[in-house]
């Protein structure tokens, strides 16, 4: 699991072309876990949103950690490193429809997303971007608890007010119910 503290490690002597950003990548044929193993072995920071699901194997029901969205992985590295990765594995950039450039996720947005989505034991809810399209809420920051420092939008999801963190156009994750005394309104 990637923690926000591990993501903050930086190398100040990098060239401009080797600057690391968070890229959203599509991995074809459900090979995201294979790409994750390769990235972990080569010290490339990566994140796959995972959740526990009940599966049946040989008549026994087991709880297994599986990707929430098939074929999606976030990688923090340089463009040249991703091009090397593309030679070994069937991956593609997720492109911004407006500009035609690869989607680059801002650091703060990704750290907030990891803080919520990387917490497998909590009751978080993953949502498709279209599920909250018509709802708008207040921007808030969580002041205390396991999600301390996370910024998102306060929205009613499944009959509870939850803080929703999103990667624009790709995926959203909502925290469990957060008591109003733990919220700081930003707007």
Predicted regions and their residues:
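Short coil-to-beta-strand transition motifs
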Residues: 134-136, 143-150
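Acidic-enriched and Gly/Ser
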Residues: 1-136, 154, 161-187
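Short beta-strand-centered aromatic/proline hotspots
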Residues: 149-157
């Amino acid at each position: 699991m990637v923690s926000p503290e591990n993501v903050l490690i930086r190398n100040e002597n990098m060239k401009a072309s080797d600057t690391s950003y968070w890229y959203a990548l599509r991995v074809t044929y459900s090979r995201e876990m294979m790409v994750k193993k390769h990235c972990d072995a080569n010290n490339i920071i990566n994140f796959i949103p995972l959740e526990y699901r009940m599966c049946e194997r040989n008549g026994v029901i087991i709880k297994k950690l599986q990707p929430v969205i098939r074929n999606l992985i976030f990688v923090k590295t340089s463009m040249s490193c991703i091009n090397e990765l593309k030679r070994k594995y069937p991956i593609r950039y997720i492109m911004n429809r407006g500009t035609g450039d690869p989607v680059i996720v801002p650091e703060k947005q990704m750290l907030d997303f990891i803080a919520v989505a990387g917490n497998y034991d909590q009751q978080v809810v993953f949502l498709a971007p279209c599920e909250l399209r018509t709802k708008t809420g207040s921007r808030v920051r969580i002041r205390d608890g396991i999600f301390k420092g996370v910024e998102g939008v306060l929205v009613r999801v499944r009959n509870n007010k939850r803080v929703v963190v999103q990667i624009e156009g790709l995926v959203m994750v909502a925290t469990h119910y957060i008591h109003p005394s733990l919220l700081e309104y930003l707007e």
